Amino acid sequence: MEAAAKVQRQMVRLRGRSYVAFVFVPTVPILDWLQEIDATIARSPGFFAGRPVVIDLSSVDLSQSGINHLLTSLQDRNIRVLGIEGVEEGRLTPMMPPLLSGGRSCVVEPSAPKKVEKAEAKPTSLLLENPVRSGQTVIFPEGDVTILGSVGSGAEVVAGGSIHVYGALRGRAMAGVNGHTSARIYCQKIEAELLAIDGFYQTADDIDAALRGKPAQAWLQGNTMRITALN
């Protein structure tokens, strides 16, 4: 049994940075793009709740008034914009969110001599022997995350690599957040609220009902997320 998501425009991308935030990449016409946002909210009313958002304007050419209208439209939808990137600073006003670069405000600081130290090797995988309970968040952008228990409803697991859940997956699982398109998500019982790989996602309503409660895996084929039963 297989379920394939429709090819999605890169409306929402989740990237690994100094924070975990949704990155919105608007496309023209903006009205159609906003309708996609509305459709996502209609399917999952709490999808963006409490999540900081960054607007990447590198794919569109908006005037200052156009940017202001976009920000107002998102605010009307209770979406909190943390910052803006991909645009010239001159197009922003002091009342708009700050211009960001790589997850931080664009502030030029004088460089100071630094002592060169030998970098310690970082682990490339994380093993959790306990369940991830409702309300908990696990973030490991360096590589794979393996959970021997279950992931509760309302919990969130974010990984730079693949995610392995040896129990029920009821919360959110976001793999490949650093652009690792070959990352996968595996679980013994799929009841997820959200699955995402390199920013392409499916919500609970998008997942084939025939797969729910069964072992499954998810991966990307081009820009399409595929979910199949895990034999």
Swiss-Prot record:
It comes from the Bacteria. One of its GO terms (biological process) is cell morphogenesis. Interacts with MinD and FtsZ. PANTHER family: SEPTUM SITE-DETERMINING PROTEIN MINC. Cell division inhibitor that blocks the formation of polar Z ring septums. Rapidly oscillates between the poles of the cell to destabilize FtsZ filaments that have formed before they mature into polar Z rings. Prevents FtsZ polymerization. NCBIfam families: minC. This is Probable septum site-determining protein MinC. It comes from Bradyrhizobium diazoefficiens (strain JCM 10833 / BCRC 13528 / IAM 13628 / NBRC 14792 / USDA 110).
